[in-house]
Curated annotation (Swiss-Prot):
It catalyses: a primary alcohol + NAD(+) = an aldehyde + NADH + H(+); a secondary alcohol + NAD(+) = a ketone + NADH + H(+). SUPFAM superfamilies: NAD(P)-binding Rossmann-fold domains. One of its GO terms (molecular function) is alcohol dehydrogenase (NAD+) activity. Substrate binds at residue 138. NAD(+) binds at residues 10-33. GO terms for cellular component: cytoplasm. This is Alcohol dehydrogenase. It comes from Drosophila picticornis. GO terms for biological process: alcohol metabolic process. Homodimer.
């Protein structure tokens, strides 16, 4: 996918990996970058606008846990304004296994809801033009960090959902791929709660191992966007971008 002159919606593009990815996207010159985030960050938005004044950057407050119908209303506002949207990035996520319901609501259900809502505008069965979904999942969807089983399971669920959306592309016209960062130096991983406090030092222990910066992750994220491979499972770890070959142990046969 060519980012230049495209219209992109980025959910949670104002913090951590999201903000650095927004910076890299803006440098590539999209026509519009629409940022949907629960928390407003005027300083970051101003920085992005200054980075490339030719890009129109718009912010809408958005919580991914709202009902699908509310998301559809917001997307209608965006589509009415832009007419077309090329790429949806779902990047909302929390890492706190004390918040079980919210972890599932944000990391998994939020991804499902936003993707479901945009199908109203993209689905070729409804006369839509199709589109591309990039879902930020996690390497914990491959192998869990067992001290945070709720977070790991929510990301595995998001990964499975993304793989299914990709396989439905011939029906909907909507392609999808997953972005799976490894341990990245963000506020998210510097301090977080393990499930039932099974390992109070889990964040500290993770950071004793090699990590990557948010910039390294963002630069590889943009490479994945440009590659635009339906069904790709991208691992973004230690400054590398690698396509994962999924091992199939069962097939529905349909």
């Amino acid at each position: 996918m060519v980012i230049a002159n495209s219209n992109i919606i980025f959910v949670a593009g104002l913090g951590g990996i999201g903000l650095d990815t927004s910076r890299e996207i803006v440098k590539s010159g999209p026509k519009n970058l629409v940022l949907l985030d629960r928390i407003d960050n005027p300083a970051a938005i101003a920085e992005l606008k200054a980075l490339n004044p030719k890009v129109t950057i718009t912010f809408y407050p958005y919580d991914v846990t709202v009902p699908v119908d509310e998301t559809k209303k917001l997307l209608k506002t965006i589509f009415d304004k832009l007419k077309t949207v090329d790429l949806l990035i779902n990047g909302a996520g929390i890492l706190d296994d004390h918040q079980i319901e919210r972890t599932i609501a944000v990391n998994f259900a939020g991804t499902v809801n936003t993707t479901t809502a945009i199908l109203d505008f993209w689905d070729k069965r409804k006369g839509g033009p199709g589109g591309v979904v990039a879902n930020i999942c996690s390497v914990t969807g491959f192998n869990s960090i067992y001290q945070v089983p709720v977070y790991s399971a929510s990301k595995a669920a998001a990964l499975s959902f993304t793989m299914s959306i990709a396989k439905l592309a011939h029906i909907t016209g909507v392609t999808a791929y997953s972005i799976n960062p490894g341990i990245t130096k963000t506020i998210l991983v510097h301090k977080f709660n393990s499930w039932l406090n099974v390992e109070p030092r889990v964040a500290e222990l993770l950071l004793e191992h090699p990590t990557q910066t948010t910039l390294q992750c963002a630069q590889n994220f943009v490479k994945a966007i440009e590659a635009n491979q339906n069904g790709a499972i991208w691992k973004l770890d230690l400054g590398r971008l690698d396509a994962i070959e999924w091992t199939k142990h069962w097939d529905s046969g349909i």
